[in-house]
Design a protein with these regions (language model features):
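Hydrophobic/aromatic positions within or immediately flanking transmembrane alpha-helices
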Residues: 27, 90, 103, 177-178
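Secretory targeting signals
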Residues: 2-4, 22-77, 103-169, 185-196, ...
Length: 257
């Protein structure tokens, strides 16, 4: 097997992912944020259930992913941007001159890591939140729950890949996080309540994520949601991710490290 075969490059990038401490730290942070906040929401709702408007056990479990995603954005940005800040990207390109192959291996290793971490985070958060809800809980086999959990895993995985693409475009972890964290944490969630901006902001990645997780509702129920369904949400999220990754590849191919 050639040292620059796809399998060898993927193995090398996988090793890089897990030899930096930031990978474990960011995944742990995502776990703590998602599970901790999801469980707290569930406990609070259970203790005051008669005053909860539009009670939905899925929202109690999965809304915390809107905070947990921020750690996965940081993970994606660091996996790429740290090589630029340290200068090790030059060494990587010397070892693997085929930039598309290197980029593909890096993105795939990061995406697989995000997928594995997201699966654990989503399942544990759901189970913990449902345990906290007690008699108001729902089960894994309830209609709509498996697709919502799968949607949450897909969303968290793709948002990490999206972050990797943006970090490659801007060639900096800090700049990528400076763009994405405010956008996902404050942007469409806050600005989405402005009627004039809704037609545009409803197509941003985080809004598609709400739809995928089945925790977005129509404006009539008090929660801002895009309302275009899971299929369209997945297409929108894939389009954003593909655009970011393709842009990242074009920048990597066309500019010196």
């Amino acid at each position: 097997m050639s040292s620059n075969s796809p399998r060898a490059v993927l193995a090398a990038e996988w090793t890089k992912v897990w030899t930096v401490r930031s990978t474990g730290y960011t995944l742990l942070l995502a776990f703590v944020l998602s599970t901790g906040i999801g469980t707290l929401i569930a406990f609070n709702w259970r203790s005051d259930i008669e005053h909860v408007v539009h009670f939905d056990p899925l929202v109690a479990a999965l809304y915390s992913m809107t905070l947990g995603q921020l750690a996965l954005v940081v993970l994606g940005a660091l996996l790429v941007g740290s090589e630029y800040s340290s200068g090790s990207i030059r060494t990587s390109l010397t070892a693997v001159p085929q930039r598309g192959l290197l980029y593909g291996g890096k993105v795939l290793a990061g995406t697989l890591t995000a997928f594995a971490g997201s699966t654990v985070i989503v399942v544990v958060t759901f189970l913990a939140a449902q345990a906290a809800l007690g008699p108001y809980r729902t089960g894994l086999g309830t209609d709509g729950v498996p697709s919502a959990l799968a949607g949450a895993v897909v969303y968290l995985t793709l948002i990490c890949a999206f972050s990797m693409g943006i970090a490659t475009v801007v060639r900096s972890s800090a700049v990528a996080m400076g763009i994405l964290l405010p956008l996902l944490f404050l942007g469409s969630q806050g600005l989405g309540n402005i009627p004039a901006l809704k037609p545009v902001l409803r197509y941003l990645p985080d809004q598609a994520g709400l739809e995928l997780m089945h925790i977005a509702g129509p404006p009539s129920d008090g929660r801002y949601g895009p309302g275009y369904g899971s299929g369209a949400a997945l297409a929108i999220l894939l389009a954003w991710t593909a655009a970011a990754l393709i842009s990242g590849y074009l920048v990597l191919r066309g500019r010196d490290a």
